[in-house]
Regions:
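C-terminal alpha-helix plus adjacent terminal tail
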Residues: 1-12, 59, 70, 164-172, ...
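Conserved CoA-thioester-binding segment of acyl-CoA-metabolizing enzymes
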Residues: 1-59
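Ligand-binding pocket scaffold of soluble enzyme catalytic domains
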Residues: 28, 75, 126
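Crotonase-fold acyl-CoA enzyme core
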Residues: 93-204
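Hydrophobic/aromatic residues within transmembrane alpha-helices
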Residues: 17, 54, 67, 114-116, ...
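Histidine-centered beta-alpha loop that forms part of the nucleotide-sugar donor binding/catalytic region
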Residues: 20, 66, 104
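Glycine- (often His-adjacent) and acidic-residue-rich active-site loop
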Residues: 56-94, 107, 135, 221, ...
Length: 257
């Protein structure tokens, strides 16, 4: 795999994906869609990868969504058309390894395909979030539907309906739970890597089972989610694990946030 629209590397059980079209605001085109299909397959199947860091080159934007100049290939038959999110979104590609998104600059429109299915989002102080669809006369549906699963409905509607007329600041994104940490730009990537190293050091099966149980619960009733979660603990936790001597587990120097 030798992608041209992103940089991809694996080290110390961490896959680092860098959107690498800064001249086009890291917008996605057909090539990027195809490359993400391969990337998510690699991440899903490579047991050496425990966690993913998704970041973007350049200072102006994490991503502004679809490349409106190049677009992407569409089937002529409307019933055969697919959404770009089917290629870009990690959970739709059955990736249950944690994804940490590090956002700087603008994150707009189709950028939410990544953000909506990230497990942890951190951003720089200059980050802004918005969805321009309605300003261009387009229905805003898929991105805000995904966003409504992680922030309050009223905030989702405000983002979707105000389009280009309002942007969510990093501070406001923190207040509404869109991001969990705001940092100076020069610290962003280092902090993402630090979080990734902490997660990657934990037992991979436990981490992936946890991610899958939580995300799948969002599409289920509470009782069904609890039954599925119980089965995952039985599958993912070896017999006798509950009786493990916890005194033998190393105690880290934990942090308070």
């Amino acid at each position: 795999m030798d992608p041209t629209t992103v940089l991809f590397e694996v080290a110390e059980h961490i896959a680092t994906i860098t959107l690498n079209r800064p001249e086009a605001m890291n917008s996605f085109n057909q090539t990027m869609l195809e490359e993400f299909t391969q990337i998510w397959q690699r991440v899903r199947e490579d047991d050496d990868i425990h966690v993913v860091v998704l970041r973007a080159a350049g200072d102006r934007a994490f991503s502004t969504g679809m490349d409106v100049k190049q677009g992407f290939d569409r089937q002529e038959n409307v019933w055969s058309q697919t959404d770009p999110g089917e290629r870009l979104s990690p959970k739709l590609n059955q990736v249950w390894k944690p994804v940490i998104c590090a956002v700087q600059g603008m994150a707009a429109g189709g950028a939410f395909y990544w953000l909506n299915e990230a497990d942890i989002i951190i951003c720089s102080q200059d980050a802004t979030f918005f969805d321009p669809h309605v300003s261009y006369g387009l229905t805003a549906a898929l991105e805000p539907i995904g966003l409504a699963r992680r922030i309050p409905l009223g905030e989702t509607l405000r983002i979707a309906l105000l389009g280009l007329d309002e942007r969510v600041s990093a501070e406001r994104a923190m207040q509404i739970g869109m991001v969990s940490e705001v940092l100076p730009r020069e610290q962003l990537w280092d902090r993402a890597n630090e979080l990734a190293r902490i997660i990657a050091a934990k037992p991979a099966a436990a981490i992936q089972g946890t991610v899958r149980a939580i995300w799948e619960s969002l599409d289920a009733t509470r009782s069904h989610a609890l039954r599925t979660g119980l089965s995952y603990t039985q599958i993912g936790n070896p017999i006798g694990k509950a009786e493990v001597d916890r005194a033998t587990v190393a105690r880290p120097n934990w942090t308070l946030r």
